[in-house]
Amino acid sequence: MPNVQSLAIIVTDPRLIISTWKDRCPAPLSSVGGMPILARLVSQLAQAGVQKTIVFALDGIGDVKRILNNRMKRMELVIRIMPTPGSGRLIDLATITEIAEFHGQVLVFTENAVIDPSLIQRLLRSSDRNITVVSRSERRRCLRLLGDIGGRLTAMLPGDSPIRESASADVSPVGIYKFDPALLRAIARIRPHRFNDDLEFFETALGLQRHQIYLMYADPQHVRRVNDATDLEAANFASSSSGDQFSILERLQAGNWRYPASEHILLCNHHFPPASVVDRLRERLQDLLYLQPSDQLDIIAKLSEMTDLPARNLAVGNGVGELIKALYGYLDPRIVIPTPTSAQYIDAVEPNKVSRFELPPENFDLDVEAFANFAKRRQASVAVLVNPNNPTGRLVPVQEIEWLASQLAIEKCRLVVDETFIEFSVAGKGNSVEKLLSVFPKMVILKSLGAIMGLGGAQIGYLASKDEQLTHGVRRRLPLGNINGIAEYLLWILPEFREEWEASFRRTRADVVSFSRMLDTIPELEVHPSQANYLFCRTPEAWPSAKHVATMLAKRYGVLVQNCENQCMKYGDRYLRLTVLPYEENRYLVSALRRINEELVEWSTQSKRAGTAYHLGC
């Protein structure tokens, strides 16, 4: 190949099938953005200036030829059957005859993946002769790689390595490489007899001191493996326009796991769990899925140990939402509730049985005396208090709740307190009213554990009250086996991670302070002090609405935030609720909001000068 300076080798396996309820298709031939994945990669290579591409198919060469017609664009294309198909594709590539006399750049692709074109350009432009593209991922892989400060590969770790918490150990190859053909030829000479294992390939390569291999990090959104139907849906979502992505996500109430999107909406603990918790779950996964979980009474016994409350005073639910419905079903209440608030406490009861107590917009603090009088006037049987408030993050002190409970008790009105986010407050559990349950036996506490464990999919919450008749009545309205095995197992292993759990709350509190200071740099954005893991912000007057800004963030910057236009409050369309994430994600959002603010201030100025509405797009 005297005139070829760049060569690409693609190893594809049409035997890998993606199945849906309506169709079955070889993974490389599955369509993303209207084009088969394999054809998409070949087209990208041609556009990047690669002069020759060799596609090695492990099977189904006819289908591969069919979909690659007219994809060359002045690039030579060769389709071959893989000579020795096995589990170690890199070892096989080292022996192929096509590179016997080749001296240019060799790009290698061994995974069925949707790749951002910029990554191919980075590989071609790099002066490094040998590169392995890596990414950080929560998925366990068969091989993990370690590099030195200069980015050179120094060691490998098999997937079953005991090292878990090292950030370096979590870097894995994504199936994209650039090799000096001399390295491939050298490995072929050293390993004429092989076990077809990629670990063996890198072990051999590390022994060749003349051929250093460098690690190139790729953002996860730049390499999307497609091995099943959910991967395919995620890849199609990622390849769609920002407007289409926003339309999909705006309709979702849950199920975000299917779509790759950055978001400041999910109210979970982002510093927990550590990877070792997930590893423990993985080790037990087969039993947790195959065998039935325990019934309520067994799980309540474990909750009793965790909360230090008697089992007879507890009920456990598949999330707080299930407990709210069971509680309301038992009480048939007329409720009063401060607003804005969590919608699930309002939606679970008939509209004519809800009275909303509006919180003052200057600070959204609850006046407990005014609220007690409001409950009395409305002859409420239940007063609901979410503390810290969702979405405002404001906290009612324990002493004030104690006074409120005493006044409501006189009127035979129960106080229901949701303490889901109490651990994120400055005093943590010190702000809980669990200590008041003995004083006010009619009081009820509700709490979601999934949120503070950082595992929204765990779906477990509990109800606590000294009113045993109530807890028994709530239990009778719940399925006997309403908690999944994964959530149950978490209750068993969490004691091993108490220190990490407590540390996660401290880290979140620090993030709240840091994020609030960053947001304060945006002119006229009013950030309310928060005792939760989210911030409630009133938008500047120059912004058309919170929803408009949320749309701009989603479409232009790929970030989802919660606009509060549907909250039960005045001027809800002026407010955003922003979940506090680790520093880099917070910084990215603030940077995007600054740029949006500059544009909207300019838009507002132009509108005033023109004396009419100046066109503004999302």
Curated annotation (Swiss-Prot):
Gene3D superfamilies: Aspartate Aminotransferase, domain 1, Spore Coat Polysaccharide Biosynthesis Protein SpsA, Chain A, Type I PLP-dependent aspartate aminotransferase-like (Major domain). The keyword Transmembrane does not apply. SUPFAM superfamilies: Nucleotide-diphospho-sugar transferases, PLP-dependent transferases. Keywords: Plasmid. GO terms for molecular function: pyridoxal phosphate binding. InterPro entries: Aminotransferase_I/II_large, Nucleotide-diphossugar_trans, PyrdxlP-dep_Trfase, PyrdxlP-dep_Trfase_major, PyrdxlP-dep_Trfase_small. Pfam families: Aminotran_1_2. GO terms for biological process: biosynthetic process. It comes from the Bacteria. The keyword Zinc does not apply. To Rhizobium NGR234A y4qD. This is Uncharacterized protein y4rO. It comes from Sinorhizobium fredii (strain NBRC 101917 / NGR234).
